Design a protein with these regions (language model features):
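Nucleic-acid substrate recognition interfaces
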Residues: 1-192
């Protein structure tokens, strides 16, 4: 089971900058995917757009840590997969509402930043802190290195929400599963 530890942080220039660059990368990649779709009616998947960004030495892509840039491109990929799934449902008459291609983010806006486990400092986690790569922000946490999944920075109007996602084994689920395994044999006999 996944849980989230949330922290609210006041506005800072560092967080403003990384979320603004995230928005720029998202819009740049979205432009390339949309243009390709309009010209060929085919989809540029995550691997293709990632290769284009690397080969063109895109400034928006390289202005963020590589793993963060990849997560933003994966987010765009999920948005387009959802768009195409809706188109397929509409063709099968399972969806009757209008479908719109993913839109650009506001020019002056900010975008979510996802930092995977690999981009979080391991030495700080052992000390009970989350240190975001390329940022000087340290956040106290109870999450351990083995449980950590990712950290998300969500921009809001006058603050940021930092969500630390971690995995926990649900003891109740584990207990029920062990009961089911033991009772499976008895259930089969009762059904016969």
């Amino acid at each position: 089971m996944y849980l989230i530890e949330r922290h609210i942080i006041k506005n800072s220039k560092e967080l403003d900058g990384i979320c603004f660059r995230s928005k720029n990368l998202y819009n740049r990649a979205l432009y390339l995917v949309r243009q390709h779709y309009f010209e060929t009616k085919k989809y540029l998947n995550y691997y293709d757009i990632n290769r284009i960004m690397i080969d063109s030495k895109d400034t928006d892509y390289y202005s963020l840590p590589c793993k963060v840039s990849n997560e933003i491109l994966k987010l765009l990929d999920r948005n387009f997969k959802s768009f195409f799934a809706l188109i397929k449902k509409k063709k099968d008459n399972k969806y009757d509402k209008s479908i719109k291609i993913p839109k650009y983010l506001d020019k002056q806006g900010k975008n979510i930043v996802v930092l995977p486990k690999q981009s979080i400092s391991k030495t700080y986690i052992r000390k009970g802190l989350i240190k975001l790569s390329s940022l000087s922000i340290e956040i106290p946490t109870k999450v351990t290195e083995s449980n950590l999944v990712e950290v998300r920075i969500l921009p809001r109007n006058n603050h940021y929400i930092v969500e630390i996602t971690y995995k926990v084994e649900d003891k109740e689920v584990a207990r029920l599963q062990s009961l089911l395994k033991g009772n499976k044999k008895h259930l089969k006999e009762l059904i016969r």
